[in-house]
């Protein structure tokens, strides 16, 4: 599934743009254990944390490409992040299925932006992931702007968590996590300030689904991934827009390992999506956003 160091897009049935690396090769977790356990309980997941090589094998078996990343929350939680370099190097060992994104805490400022530039230039990183609620920043407060400047310069997408999160769910005070920081309307500001940056709003953005649809409809550089929810629970307005106005701007994402691609795809097959739109969501839109070349007919 790989040609000359790149994904062989024609060999893939789909591209999953939202896959978490939750543990590194040394057993270090991406999040504090109590927050990770809360998320697993929220999703009814089995608490299993596959390693990067295991994820590669899982996706290769299914002929699915996967965008992989961690979430750097070190400044807010004090928990050291999984190495972006390790993820990028691991993805380079599995170029037929894995596409690496970085995650850098916006609190790291210009130093973080320099680190991101090195990851792009020296390690082949293809985008950046943010989780405003867990990283404790508002997307429009400019703290992430040095990182976004680098992403825009290189033409790389920025993936932002939006809506409610399972991380910290049920813990006292929600583990200190503020949901309002993941309101997709905050990304409307970012889309104005970075008109040439590709922005992906992750997840059906409960309780702000209509806001997310409005931003994605109004701003040509804003997309939506469908991760974190089984398609059978998608709000009707999301399905309606995915079938019409946003058919070229909606992307398959699972949120693995919390939701498996098998479960997501099985439920998506039962969703009332137009036959002409289905391949766009599963692969073609991701090919465009990730700069993987023309998708074959």
Show the residue positions of the predicted features.
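Catalytic pocket-lining loop regions of alpha/beta-barrel enzymes
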Residues: 30, 126-127, 140-251
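Short aromatic-enriched loop/helix-cap "lid" or pocket-rim segments at secondary-structure transitions
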Residues: 25-31, 80-81, 113-114, 170-173, ...
């Amino acid at each position: 599934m790989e040609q000359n160091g790149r994904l062989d897009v024609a060999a893939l049935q789909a591209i999953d743009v939202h896959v978490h690396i939750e543990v590194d090769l040394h057993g270090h977790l991406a999040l504090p254990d109590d927050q990770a356990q809360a998320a697993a309980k929220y999703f009814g997941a089995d608490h299993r944390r596959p390693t990067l090589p295991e994820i590669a094998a899982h996706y290769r078996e299914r002929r699915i490409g996967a965008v992989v990343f961690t979430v750097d929350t070190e400044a807010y939680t004090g928990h050291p992040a999984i190495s972006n370099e390790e993820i990028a190097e691991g993805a380079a060992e599995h170029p037929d299925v894995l596409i690496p994104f970085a995650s850098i805490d916006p609190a790291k400022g210009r130093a973080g932006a320099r680190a991101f530039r090195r990851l792009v230039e020296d390690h082949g990183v293809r985008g950046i992931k943010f989780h405003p609620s867990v990283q404790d920043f508002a997307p429009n407060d400019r703290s992430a702007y040095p990182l976004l400047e680098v992403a825009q310069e290189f033409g790389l997408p920025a993936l932002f968590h939006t809506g409610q999160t399972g991380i910290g769910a049920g813990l006292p005070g929600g583990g200190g996590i503020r949901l309002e920081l993941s309101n997709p309307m905050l990304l409307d500001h970012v889309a104005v300030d970075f008109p040439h940056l590709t922005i992906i709003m992750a997840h059906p953005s409960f309780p702000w689904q209509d806001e997310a649809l409005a931003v994605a409809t109004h701003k040509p550089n804003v997309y939506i991934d469908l991760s974190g929810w089984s398609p059978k629970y998608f709000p009707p307005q999301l399905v309606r827009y995915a079938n019409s106005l946003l058919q070229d701007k909606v992307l398959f994402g699972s949120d693995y390992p919390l939701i498996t691609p098998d479960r997501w795809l099985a439920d998506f097959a039962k969703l009332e999506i137009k036959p002409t739109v289905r391949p766009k969501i599963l692969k073609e839109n991701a090919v465009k956003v990730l700069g993987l070349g023309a998708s074959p007919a």
